[in-house]
A protein has these predicted regions:
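Glycine-rich FAD pyrophosphate-binding loop
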Residues: 21-40
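FAD/FMN-dependent oxidoreductases across multiple families
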Residues: 116, 132, 206-284, 290-294
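Hydrophobic anchor at the start of a short beta-strand
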Residues: 4, 25-27, 138, 175
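Beta1/beta-strand and adjacent pyrophosphate-binding region of the FAD-binding site
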Residues: 1-10
Length: 386
């Protein structure tokens, strides 16, 4: 029986463990902390739970969010109804559920620190404070702060973004997204079970500066940070030039989730890509087509994330029709049903970045017409003779 060592017990590692153990492989999962919280983590799109229905068909506490409010300077705000709701868990609860599923499938869960992983030519030696374990193959799921230098992606300074936030008492039904000037990122308010997650993510700006932006926003909204729990996390956010050299596999190993750099460079979403990459890695291993893993990732979603990395700066910092792109996005969503439908599909995960430009151009004339009509220009359009 093939022996598999999974290094990391987050969603990617836990799901890979379940998939491989269910197929009859001997799986050991090593993680120092196991289930833990993240600043915003726990949000699942329709794309995720439609492919993996167990993500909603369970008794774990969760929130179904059916509207998002987008806001930008000089544009006000707009409500985007979500026909396919976002599902929000406590990341702690979601991670614990995935680990429980892995254990029920037969995986051996080890709460311990991995001090060293050594390739012995035909097998791995995994060292922990309690001894060593041997494995024929390694799945690397150690997250963005991967201490195993020879395994997983190699993040450069420009390949990360900071995410930080507070858990504060409160209740609301919607998600708030606030764009800010000169920020390649955004502020969020996510409703959770029993509290709110108020946070910020941004690329190319120090965490201290992001925290000041967030606390200024919270003060303006009347949200107190006093006594609130603070969290921070590093997210992969690969530059366009980094995707082609992204190290996702090697002799005797594959990386999944954040450890493979597989995070949406625009939204910062990583949960779907953690689960999906774990699934694809398990398939490649079980079919003994490990060399095809990179190709499977590219065909499934990585090529789209690479394309998204080229769009990110233009979306957050670019200009269109003499205004900032985020402001135009809010205004177009408010005035154009066509554009609002595009935004809904983006939130659901149905709209790829590769097809986004074509869809926007295809709908541009119609969207501009709808905007003109909504602004009162219908009075200037001659009516057809009845």
């Amino acid at each position: 029986m093939k022996r598999i060592a999974i290094l990391g017990g987050g969603p990617a590692g836990a799901f890979a463990a379940e998939r491989l153990a269910s197929a009859g492989l001997a799986v050991q999962l090593f993680d120092e902390k196991l289930a833990w919280e993240k600043p915003c983590g726990g949000g699942l799109t329709y794309k995720a739970y439609s492919q993996y229905p167990f993500l909603v068909d369970n008794d774990i506490p969760k929130r179904f969010v059916r509207e998002t409010v987008l806001a930008a300077p000089r544009a006000g705000e707009v409500c985007v109804p979500l026909s396919d709701p976002l599902v929000i868990y406590s990341r702690l609860d979601l991670n614990r559920m995935l680990l429980d599923r892995a254990e029920r499938a037969g995986a051996q869960i080890e709460k311990t620190h991995v001090s060293e992983v050594r390739w012995q030519g035909s097998a791995w030696e995994v060292r922990t404070p309690f001894g060593t374990a041997d494995a024929d193959f390694c799945i690397v799921a150690t997250g963005a702060r991967n201490s195993l230098r020879n395994l997983g992606t190699q993040l450069k300074a420009g390949d990360t973004m900071s995410a930080l936030g507070y858990y504060v008492p409160g209740e609301q039904a919607r998600i708030d997204i606030q764009f800010l000037p000169h920020l390649e990122g955004y502020i969020w308010i996510f409703p959770r079970c029993g509290h709110l997650s108020v946070g910020i993510c941004g690329k190319g700006e120090p965490a201290g500066s992001l925290r000041k932006r967030l606390e200024r926003f919270m003060s303006e909204r009347g949200i107190s940070a006093k006594g609130a729990r603070f969290y921070s996390h590093l997210l992969p956010s690969l530059d366009a030039s980094s995707w082609h050299e992204n190290r996702v596999a090697g002799e005797g190993w594959m990386a999944v989730g954040d450890a493979a750099g597989l995070v949406d460079p625009i939204t910062g979403e990583g949960l779907y890509y953690a689960l999906r990459s774990a699934d694809l890695a398990a398939r490649a291993l079980l079919s003994e087509k490990i060399g095809q893993y990179r190709r499977l990732l590219a065909r499934d979603f990585a090529a789209d994330l690479e394309f998204g990395s080229r769009l990110a700066k233009r979306i957050f910092l670019g200009r269109f029709l003499f205004g900032a792109v985020p402001a135009r996005m809010v205004q177009f969503t408010r005035r154009s049903p066509r554009f609002s439908a595009i935004m809904q599909d983006l939130f659901a995960g149905r709209q790829s970045y590769q097809e986004l430009k074509r869809r926007l151009l295809r709908n541009l004339n119609g969207s501009l017409y709808e905007i003109a009509m909504s602004l009162g220009f219908s009075r200037l359009v001659p009516r057809k003779a009845g």
